Design a protein with these regions (language model features):
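Thiamine diphosphate
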Residues: 107, 115-122, 269-272, 316-318, ...
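Conformationally flexible catalytic loops at phosphate/diphosphate-handling active centers
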Residues: 140, 152, 156-207, 362
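Phosphate/pyrophosphate-binding active-site segments
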Residues: 2-10, 144, 180-181, 203, ...
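Glycine-rich phosphate/diphosphate-binding loops that line cofactor/substrate pockets in enzymes
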Residues: 17-28, 68-74, 98, 156-161, ...
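Active-site diphosphate/adenylate-binding microenvironment
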Residues: 19-20, 34-37, 42-43, 47, ...
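A short, small-residue-rich loop immediately preceding and capping a beta-strand
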Residues: 29-33, 52-54, 72-111, 214-217, ...
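Glycine-rich, acidic loop regions that bind phosphate or pyrophosphate groups
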Residues: 108-149, 171, 245-353
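Glycine-rich, anion-gripping cofactor-binding loops and their flanking helix/strand elements
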Residues: 71, 218-306, 408-431, 435-440, ...
Length: 565
């Protein structure tokens, strides 16, 4: 048991030393940073600390790596950046943590206290900069308050709906000495459902004829997934996962019906619309899973919703639930052991049909795209050779459909994908995942435009010996935007074409392994060589530009749009 020092016997330490000790106290084992002179005292204190420091090439990448670790562990990912441009560069990662409900703490250097308010070199008001995307923004002006405010930062990042906290550190505060006790390690509070609420849920399920469940959000665990899987199996309950949350339910289970993402299976939507009870656990039913807020009426849904969420403010925020349950997914799923059907449920065929529809939708066999490289066969090969616990990472772009539709997620903490749709996330997320669990295989899917948003972090993977594999789909364009152009302004291509480097040579220039893949037959041996190389690898896959989605072409979209004019 940790016994904190008392103020009377605490040694005098600098603010930087006190801060690093608080990180250790709260269980931090790794952090990500781009160094800056504004927090040199912290860097010096880290020299002697048992914390693995990953030095990154750009603050956005560092923040995304920290967010990825927060997403995988449920503990705050830690990132340090310098003031001004360092902070603004990191903002993309903070925004991801906000929309993904990921615990994260961004520490930002700040100008000396005496210079505040004078627009000093690289000075920013971090409350104004991050106020709309962080749960809390605080500046620590007194080293004696470091334990108090860091403890609060960990609590804020993990409680209720998790999210990012931003802590500003004036450089002279970090060098000032103080005698202060360390805080006790933070603990995450679980909000539990009441027995009466669980009895009401059982009654609602018992009366339903076609219920469904939708899983999303954060504050899940491997145990919680197992518990909900057992519950769904007992009730033969069709289960759907929210946008980029497929890791919350095993895709090979007979109750799994697919995910509510982009380009969703129309049969899936029809089943949810026809349901007479919707159990939502952890998610918020935000824009993408709600299909542009069209799947459920606001504020009074046609389908009765039982909404379970860790944050009371999310219950009834958009949709008036028939039954709100204020509980974390972990506490709620533990209570589900007592919720079992009194008799055989009448909708088992409904669940079987939903799973059959998912299997047909995710079948790679009928998928044919223009060009010599058939991505359906590529996905089938990945399913054949990769371990089930492979961590898949992606940023934003049409390329991500290949993962979300065709990879069967069966393992918790195996998916790193931003619900915010942030481009460039996949590579730094892969670095963060591999740094956390080096024994796990990590595969990054990226587009050509997406990859170069944070492609420099390939150097970070090389520096730390992290053999991630990047499957880079190159169609020489910002494909998603081009797709929308053809739908809205057919034939009028504007600002979406790209001239790309040789990504095989790019990987090799950094000291990694590179392959160029132009045909289906070349992919399997290229992947095998990459896996055997022991190096960070890029498989530069050249895709026919017409193959804009697994089932659609640019020409087809253009023709359809022109026919409507």
């Amino acid at each position: 048991m940790t016994t904190p020092s008392t103020p009377s016997n605490a040694a005098s330490r600098t603010g930087g030393q006190i801060l690093v000790q608080q990180l250790i106290t709260h269980g931090v084992k790794q952090l990500f940073c781009v160094p800056g002179e504004s927090y040199l005292a912290v860097l010096d204190a880290l020299h002697d600390a048992d914390i693995a420091v990953t030095v990154c090439r750009q603050e956005g990448g560092a923040a995304m790596m920290a967010e990825a670790q927060g997403k995988l562990t449920g503990q705050p990912g830690i990132c340090f950046v310098t003031r001004g441009p360092g902070a603004t560069n990191a903002s993309a990662g903070v925004h991801i943590a906000h929309q993904d409900s990921t615990p994260m703490i961004l520490f930002v250097g700040q100008v000396a206290r005496g210079a505040l308010g004078r627009e000093a070199f690289q000075e920013l008001d971090y409350g104004a900069v991050f106020g709309t995307m962080a749960k809390w923004v605080v500046q620590i002006d007194d080293p004696a308050r470091v334990p108090e405010l860091i403890s609060r930062a960990f609590h804020g990042a993990t409680s209720g709906r998790p999210g990012p906290v931003v802590v500003a550190l004036p450089e002279d505060m970090l060098t000032e000495a103080a005698s202060v006790a360390d805080a006790l390690p933070y603990q995450v509070a679980e909000t539990h459902p009441g027995a009466a609420q669980m009895a009401e849920l059982a009654e609602r399920l018992g009366k339903a004829k076609q219920p469904v469940a939708i899983l999303g959000g954060s504050r899940w665990s491997e145990q919680a997934v197992r518990e909900f899987t057992a519950f769904a199996e007992a009730w033969s309950l069709p289960v759907y996962c929210s946008f980029r949350r497929q890791m919350l339910f095993p895709a090979n289970h007979a109750c799994y019906g697919g995910d509510l993402g982009l380009g969703v299976n129309p049969k899936l939507l029809a089943r949810i619309r026809a349901s007479d009870l919707v159990l939502v656990v952890g998610g918020r039913l935000s824009e993408v899973p709600s299909q542009g807020y069209e799947l459920f009426a606001i504020p009074n849904p046609v389908q009765p919703i039982v909404h379970v969420h860790a944050d009371a403010d999310e219950l009834g925020k958009l949709y008036r639930p028939a039954q709100p349950i204020h509980a974390t997914p972990q506490a709620f799923t533990a209570a589900l052991a007592a919720v079992r059907p009194a008799a055989i449920v009448p909708w088992k065929a409904h669940a079987e049909a939903a799973h059959a529809e998912y299997l047909a939708w995710s079948d790679t066999a009928p998928i044919r795209i223009p060009g010599d490289l058939q991505m359906g066969q590529v996905m089938q090969h990945l399913k054949d050779v990769l371990p089930a616990d492979t961590i898949f990472c992606n940023g934003a772009g049409n390329f991500a459909t290949w993962i979300h539709r065709f990879w069967p997620f069966t393992t918790f903490a195996s998916q790193l994908a931003p619900t915010s749709g942030s481009m460039g996330y996949g590579l730094p997320a892969g670095v963060g995942g591999k740094r956390l669990w080096p024994q796990r295989e990590v595969v990054v899917f990226a587009g050509d435009g997406d990859f170069l948003m944070h492609g420099q972090e390939f150097a970070t993977a090389v520096q730390y010996g992290l053999p991630i594999i990047v499957v880079l789909l190159d169609n020489a364009m910002y494909g998603t935007i081009r797709m929308h152009q053809e739908r809205e302004y057919p034939g009028r291509v504007s600002a979406t074409a790209l001239k790309n480097p040789d990504f095989k040579a790019y990987a090799q220039a950094f000291g990694g392994h590179g392959e160029r893949v132009t045909t289906t037959e070349e992919f399997a041996p290229a992947l095998a060589r990459a896996r055997a190389s022991g190096l960070p690898s890029v498989l530069h896959c050249l895709i026919n530009p017409e193959a804009i989605t697994p089932t659609g072409t640019l020409q087809g979209m253009r023709n359809a749009a022109l026919a409507k004019k």
